[in-house]
Amino acid sequence: TXIVIIGGGPGGYEAA
């Protein structure tokens, strides 16, 4: 839930 963005660049982590 929610939106969590860690790194935001190549090799980063994004969960919506």
From Swiss-Prot:
Primary enzyme class: oxidoreductase
UniProt GO MF annotations: ferredoxin-NAD+ reductase activity
EC number: 1.18.1.3
Keyword Nucleotide-binding: no
Cofactor(s) named in the record: FAD; Mg(2+)
Catalytic reaction list: 2 reduced [2Fe-2S]-[ferredoxin] + NAD(+) + H(+) = 2 oxidized [2Fe-2S]-[ferredoxin] + NADH
Keyword terms of this UniProt record: FAD, Flavoprotein, Magnesium, NAD, Oxidoreductase
Tree of life domain: Bacteria
Function: Couples electron transfer from NADH to cytochrome P450(soy) in the presence of ferredoxin.
Name of the protein in question: Ferredoxin--NAD(+) reductase
Taxonomy of the source species: Bacteria, Bacillati, Actinomycetota, Actinomycetes, Kitasatosporales
